[in-house]
Each structure stands twice: as C-alpha cells, then as structure tokens.
Amino acid sequence: MRSNEGNKGVLASLDWFTISLYLILVTWGWFSVCGASYDFINPDIFGWSTNSGKQLVWIGTAIILGSMLLLIEKRFYDTSAYFIYMTMIMLLIVTIIIAPETKGSKSWIPIGPVKLQPAEFAKFAVALTISKLMNTYGFTLANTRQFAQVAALILLPMLLIICQKETGSALVYLSFFLVLYREGMTGAFLFTGFAMIVYFVVGIRFSTEQLSYMPVIVGEFIVHLLISIFTIAMTWVYTRNWQLTRTLALTVIGSTILALLFSAYVIPFNICHVQLIANTAMTITLIVMAFTTRTAKLTFIALFAIISTSFFYASNHVFHKVLQDHQRTRIEVLLGINDDIRRAGYNVNQAKIAIGSGGLTGKGFLNGTQTKLKYVPEQDTDFIFCTVGEEEGFIGSAALLLTYLVFIFRLIHLAERQPDTMGRVYGYSVLCIFLFHLFINVGMVLGLTPVIGIPLPFFSYGGSSLWGFTILLFILLRIDAERNLKRQ
C-alpha cells in the first residue's frame, strides 16, 4: 500500500513539462530519421531492416527504461555511485580489448543484432560520482587535493575513450569542468582552458607560415608571445605587484623585440628559442619569489606558464603524430588550411547545401533531394540537423533550436532548485552535457566547429546515444521529484 502511495506521489511530483519536451524532441527526431534514411526501393519506415524502424524500437525501450528509472530512489544513486562508476570504467577497459574496429574506432560492443557504445553510458556514471563526492561534508574545490580527485574522476574515462580512438566522445567529458565553475572553481581554470584552445588554433593555423625572411614559424612565435603576455597579465591581476610585473614585461617582451630586430637586420635565426628561454627564466623567477614571499598565487601563475608551454608542444605532436588522417584533415578544413570540398570538406559542404536548399519553409517531409539521394554522409546520425534544414526550412530549424533552448533553460531551473549539492551538481552535469552536444553538433553541420562525430540529443539515429541521454535526464527527474516529495 505504501509502495503504491509512494509511486502516486512520484508521478504527481514529476516535472511533466520537461517530460513533454523530451517526448516532443524524441518524436521530432524519429520523423527526421525517417526523412534522412527513407529509401525509395524499400519505403517501409516501420520495418526492422530500416533505420527508422530500429529507431522506433530504441525510442520504445528508452521510454520503458526512463519509466523504470523514475521508480529508483535517490538514496540508491547516493550509495551506489562509486560502484556504478567502477563498473563503467571496467566496461570501458573491456571495450578496448574485445571491441572490433568499426570506422576506425574500437568503441562498440556487439550484443546479438545490436551494438552498444559504453562511452555514452559512462557519462551518467561520472555525473553521479562527482555529485556524490562534492556532496561530502567539508568538500571544497579550493582544496587542491579534492579538486584533483574530481578532475581524476572526469579524466580517467576520457583517457580510456581516447584509447578506443573515439576522440569526439572523449571531448564531451570536458563539459564537466563547467559544472565545477558553478560550484566555486576559480575562473582562472576556465581562462587556462580558453588559453589552451587559442594556443592550439593559432599554432596549427600558422604552422606552415614563416615570419618574413627569417627561419621562424609564425604560429610558434605568436604562441610564445601569447604565453608571455598572459603570464605577465596574470601576475598583475593576482598580485598587484607593479614592480614585479614591470620587470617581467621589460625583460621578456624586451628580449623578444631585440631578438626580432637582430634576426631581421643582422643574422637570421629562430627567435622562438630566445622566447622559450625568456619564458623559462620568467617562470623560474616566479617560482623563486613564490617560495621566498610565500605567495601561493605566484606558484599558480608559474604553473600556468609551464602548462601553457608543455601543452603547445604536446598538442603540436598529437596533431601531427597521433591524430588519424581524417581527424587531422577535418581540423585543417575548419581552420582554412585545407579547402578540399571534394574530400575533407565534403560532408560539411553537402550539409550546407542541404540546409540552404530548404529555404524558408523547407521541401516537406520525405521530399529532401540532398538527403534522399544520399549526398550527405552520416545524414541520420551526426548530420541529422541538415535533414531538418532541408525538409522543414529555416522555420523548422529555428523552431527546433528554440525548443532546445527552452529545454536547456528548464534544466537550469531544475538544477538550481535542488536543495543539496548532489542534486545541483548532477543537474548541471546533465545540462552541460546536453549543451556541449547541441553546440558542437549544430556547429559542425554549419561548419563552425570541427567534425568530431557526436550525436544531436534525442535526434540522431542510434540506441546507445538515445538511452544514454534518457538515463541522464530521467535520473535528474527522479531526484527532482524526490525534492517535491520531501517538501510535501
């Protein structure tokens, strides 16, 4: 009797507005999969042999899975978070060992007629675990050891997924660091992340250009200069020590200018070596002063300079030696280094044509020529948004993005109204994952971000991604419903 009353209480406390948005997006997504995978020879959209038929099964099982998750109390996740996390870590390791290679990656485990991608399910495990850890008494991100624990929980599955050669899925886990910012992580960490992106983009974009007639790579020169400027600026912002800031600026920037003039008018040489030496001397100075004056902020600034330099050379090595050819080429196309629209840029170019051909109102359901004639590769998975653009036009695309925007703001509302840290952190984890997927997927279809192969939530064809997103959302809905039950 109590169980029935409890279930009725959960149903009454559920956020049905969010569930309605979920059902709208899932249904809309299925029609888009129908449009993207429709075959004139085999027009049956409900058959198991078609992607639309399979997706209908995934949707049905996802709804059943979500309904079952609503019956599990929050305390189960609280007590089992670490066990779930370790189970997913073991599954990721097993995937590396036994998974067959599919399209260059080893991330799919075949189970009978279907394949599952553990990387999609590891997201909710990480979200639960960091929520559990950050909810412990006395936890603070200001504590270096505790921050390192959270970072390790995020980076471990990320590294395992990279070992599966699934770089796109691994990058999604970086979105968890945005959650930490909401929980009090200093903005310096976000600035460091921004700086790393700038180093990578500038270093790669200008890696083949020389500075005038000197043996100097423009990308390397600019990155070293940026490291100097950022480090000096941080010294002033965090210490307000004008004398130290001025000394570092005159020494580092001054030596760079002198080396540039000497190389231009006397003997040409690679002035990046001088920049590296100057930045190293600056870093050593900061470390020495940190110990002598017992100023922890100087240690952090020195660490920033070390990480910046290390990241630049490491990312350069990874780009040229570790990334697969198709991954490297996609980045080159995005940065304008490679404009081969017949090969590297073919996917994005065809997606743009499909979206542009839709016009204002679109061509109508199942009437898209670009998608029906299979001009757009992966049109029912990674490039599903171009089907919306072609069949439903600008109005349909704008309506979809508006629906996602409402969904995102609703997640913010759910996260903010949680009474404890665990619920709030989990809510923001779900939010950041959805936001990252939405921004990157739509961005790569429009040619604004690299093509890294991540699905559009609730839209892209595939059971693993749909189940993974459903698990993330419905656990949050149960946690939120329990908040209402306690209030009653």
What are these regions (language model features)?
Residues M1-L11:
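Short, Lys/Arg-rich, polar N-terminal cytosolic tail immediately upstream
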Residues F230-M234, G447-N484, Q488:
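Transmembrane alpha-helices of multi-pass inner-membrane enzymes
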Residues L21-G35, D39-R342, C386-M444, I471, ...:
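Hydrophobic alpha-helical transmembrane segments of multi-pass inner membrane proteins, especially
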Residues E166-L171, K363-G368, Q379-T381, I452, ...:
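Transmembrane helix boundary and interhelical junction motifs in multipass membrane proteins
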Residues L116, Q350, F458-F459:
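Short hydrophobic beta-strand that contains or immediately precedes a catalytic carboxylate
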Residues V10-L11, Q146-F147, L373-V376, Q418-P419:
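Helix-boundary and loop/linker segments of multi-pass membrane transporters
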Residues L14-I24, Y82-I84, M88, I353-K363:
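Alpha-helical transmembrane segments of integral membrane proteins, especially early/N-terminal helices
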